[in-house]
Curated annotation (Swiss-Prot):
Domains (record comment): The N-terminal domain interacts with the head of the 30S subunit; the C-terminal domain interacts with the body and contacts protein S4. The interaction surface between S4 and S5 is involved in control of translational fidelity.
Domain S5 DRBM: 20-83
Any single GO BP term: translation
GO CC, alphabetical: small ribosomal subunit
Repeat in keyword set: no
InterPro entries: Ribosomal_Su5_D2-typ_SF (IPR020568), Ribosomal_uS5 (IPR000851), Ribosomal_uS5_bac-type (IPR005712), Ribosomal_uS5_C (IPR005324), Ribosomal_uS5_N (IPR013810), Ribosomal_uS5_N_CS (IPR018192), Ribsml_uS5_D2-typ_fold_subgr (IPR014721)
PROSITE patterns: RIBOSOMAL_S5, S5_DSRBD
Entry superkingdom: Bacteria
Organism, scientific name: Brucella ovis (strain ATCC 25840 / 63/290 / NCTC 10512)
The protein, known as: Small ribosomal subunit protein uS5
NCBIfam families named among the record's database cross-references: rpsE_bact (TIGR01021)
Amino acid sequence: MAQRERNREERGREERDSEFVDKLVHINRVAKVVKGGRRFGFAALIVVGDQKGRVGFGHGKAREVPEAIRKATEAAKRDMIFVPLRSGRTLHHDVEGRHGAGKVLLRAAPAGKGIIAGGPMRAVFETLGVQDVVAKSLGSSNPYNMVRATFDALKHQMHPKDIAAQRGIKYSTLQARRHDVVGSEE
C-alpha cells in the first residue's frame, strides 16, 4: 500500500518537473582516499531551465552516476534565477561575467543568428530559452567556472524598464536613444 502511494507521488512529481529541461554539462570521476585505498565516486554538473527565462545549475556527488545526476538536478531546481529576455529570444544588452579565472562575454544577436557559444555556455542558453546570442569565453575553460561566470553575467542582465527607472527617465526616451545609437551604427 505504501509503495503504491510513493509511486503515485513520484509520478506527480515527474509531471510537475516536466516543464523543465535539463542538460548534463560535465561528469567527472572523483576519488576519496581512505586508509584501505581509494573510494571512487562521480560528480555531475547539470543545468536546468524552463526555456522561458528561468535557469539554474547544480553540482552533485555520489558513488553512482544516476544518483549524482539526481542530486545535481535537485540542487539546480532549488537555485534558479530569472533572466529577462528581449522578444523571448535574446538578451537585452551585452554583458560580462567572471568567476575565478573564467570570464565570459555575452552579446545580444539579431534574429536567426543562433546560439554561438562553446560547450557549457551553450547548455545554459538552450535551457534558458535563448535562441540568438553570441558568447565568448576568455580565461579558464573549466566547465564549473564557465557556468558560474555565465550565471554571473546573466544576473547582471536588466530589463530596459528597470534601467530607465534607475536613471530616472522614461522608458520611451531610453528606447528612442537606443534606436538612435543602433541606427547610426548601421
